[in-house]
């Protein structure tokens, strides 16, 4: 699972997901890509599940690029705990995804293979996505 080696602070504010993605919204490495259409937090587990789905389907052919990294820590309070006594303990890592963000890229395979692989990865994501091709 992906996570930062070290961070400056142990806990983080939740923040807002306003507007669309202006960085990471163009295909940079491969020929085909999966692009987010909605905003969401995507967990490290979901990123890994999508990556596995693509690599299993594409087998040895092609190369996969994961274009997002979970760098935001999410805290949770234990169940049936009273309010107060500080913020919860860090539980998992997420990547903040805005509409337009490229999630995965793939190259070196045919369009049909890429489309099916991306469809499998999209089913692991909590958001609507679209398949795009580099012009």
From Swiss-Prot:
Task: Tell me the protein family, please.
Answer: Belongs to the universal ribosomal protein uL16 family.
Q: Which UniProt keywords apply?
A: Chloroplast, Plastid, Ribonucleoprotein, Ribosomal protein
- Quick one: where is this thing mainly located? plastid
Look up the record and report any one GO term of the cellular component aspect.
Answer: chloroplast
The record's Gene Ontology biological-process terms are:
mitochondrial translation
What is this protein called in UniProt? Large ribosomal subunit protein uL16c
The compartments listed are: Plastid, Chloroplast
**Does the entry feature the keyword Ribosomal protein, yes or no?**
yes
Assembly information from the UniProt record: Part of the 50S ribosomal subunit.
Name the segments for region: Disordered: 1-20
State the Gene Ontology terms under molecular function: rRNA binding; structural constituent of ribosome
Q: Which domain of life is it from?
A: Eukaryota
**InterPro entries documented for this protein:** Ribosomal_uL16, Ribosomal_uL16_bact-type, Ribosomal_uL16_CS, Ribosomal_uL16_dom, Ribosomal_uL16_sf
């Amino acid at each position: 699972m992906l996570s930062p080696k070290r961070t400056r602070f142990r806990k983080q504010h939740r923040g807002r997901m306003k507007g669309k993605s202006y960085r990471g919204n163009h295909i940079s490495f491969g020929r085909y890509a999966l692009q987010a259409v909605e905003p969401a937090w995507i967990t490290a587990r979901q990123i890994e599940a999508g990556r596995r789905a693509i690599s299993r389907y594409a087998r040895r052919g092609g190369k996969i690029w994961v274009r997002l990294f979970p760098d935001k820590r999410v805290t949770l309070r234990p169940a049936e705990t009273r309010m107060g006594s500080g913020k919860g303990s860090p539980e998992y890592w997420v990547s903040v995804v805005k509409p337009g963000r490229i999630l995965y890229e793939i190259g070196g395979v045919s369009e049909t293979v890429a489309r099916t692989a991306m469809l499998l990865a999209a089913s692991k994501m909590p958001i609507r996505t679209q398949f795009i091709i580099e012009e």
